[in-house]
Curated annotation (Swiss-Prot):
The encoding gene: SYNGR4
Assigned keywords, A-Z: Membrane, Transmembrane, Transmembrane helix
Positions of region (Disordered): 191-226
Family in the record: Belongs to the synaptogyrin family.
Pfam families, A to Z: MARVEL
Position of the signal peptide: none
UniProt membrane topology term: Multi-pass membrane protein
GO CC annotations, alphabetized: neuromuscular junction; synaptic vesicle membrane
Residue ranges of every copy of the MARVEL domain listed in the record: 18-169
Subcellular location: Membrane
Protein name stated in the entry: Synaptogyrin-4
TM helices/strands, residue ranges: 25-45, 66-86, 104-124, 145-165
Length: 234
């Protein structure tokens, strides 16, 4: 294992360059926001009321709201970690079809998670708005943190979908590109010259190639037979 000897070597290392990519930064933010959502409700999201010791969800005593937020946050956190690990090995993918399928899956999941967090944010905000004030002793800060970072998760996953779409569009292979280029060259060379295209006409002077070929053509095309010479008698 190579240990960097200076800060410049550390900054130029492959791991640091990978973490500086916009896609990697976006996945890290998405994972951190998801971690805050499910951890805040998992720890302080269930509190007892002032009149009894039974635990209830701080979001309008609706256990479904807390369960959805915890489940969505946990799955989004694991999804961000999984795709971050796959991004690290993306350069080693030899198959172009597999790489395209991976980018398409990344785009689809980013759009799905953006929609999930949009619905979740609206649902959590609605349940918190319906919660009676000072109904629980603790847990209000956890509920506000979950709602806030649910909204931030919408923006992060939308940007992640945008990055995935740009990468898919830029890296999409064009089938038969070389064949089409070669066919275009052949058709261009066989097509008749247009009025706009320059036509190179050979010169007809004594030093031109057409003059030389015309002057040599009779000797090259019709060879003469040998003649018999008559010698006079002495």
């Amino acid at each position: 294992m190579h240990i960097p000897e200076s800060l410049q070597d550390l900054a130029d290392s492959e791991a640091v360059q990978f973490l500086k990519r916009p896609k990697a930064i976006t996945r890290i933010f998405a994972g951190v926001f998801s971690l805050i959502v499910f951890s805040s409700l998992l720890t302080d999201g269930y509190q007892n009321k002032t009149d009894n010791s039974e635990l209830h969800c701080v979001l309008n005593s609706n256990s479904t709201a807390c369960s959805i937020a915890v489940g969505a946050g946990l799955l989004a956190f694991l999804s961000s970690l999984a795709f971050l690990a796959l991004d690290a090995h993306e350069v080693r993918l030899a198959s172009t079809r597999f790489k395209t399928a991976f980018q398409l899956l990344d785009l689809i999941l980013a759009v799905i998670w953006a929609g999930v967090w949009a619905v979740g944010f609206c649902f959590l905000a609605n349940q918190w708005h319906r919660s009676p004030p000072r109904y629980f002793l603790l847990g209000s800060n956890s509920a506000k943190a979950a709602i806030t970072f649910s909204f931030f998760s919408i923006l992060v996953w939308i940007f992640q979908a945008y990055l995935a779409f740009q990468e898919l569009r830029n890296d999409a292979p064009v089938p038969y590109k070389r064949s089409l280029d070669e066919g275009g060259v052949v058709l261009t060379s066989l097509s008749p010259p247009s009025a706009a295209s320059p036509v190179n006409t050979p010169t007809t002077g004594p030093h031109g190639p057409s003059y030389a070929s015309s002057s040599l053509s009779p000797y090259l095309s019709t060879p003469k037979a040998p003649r018999l010479a008559m010698m006079p008698d002495n």
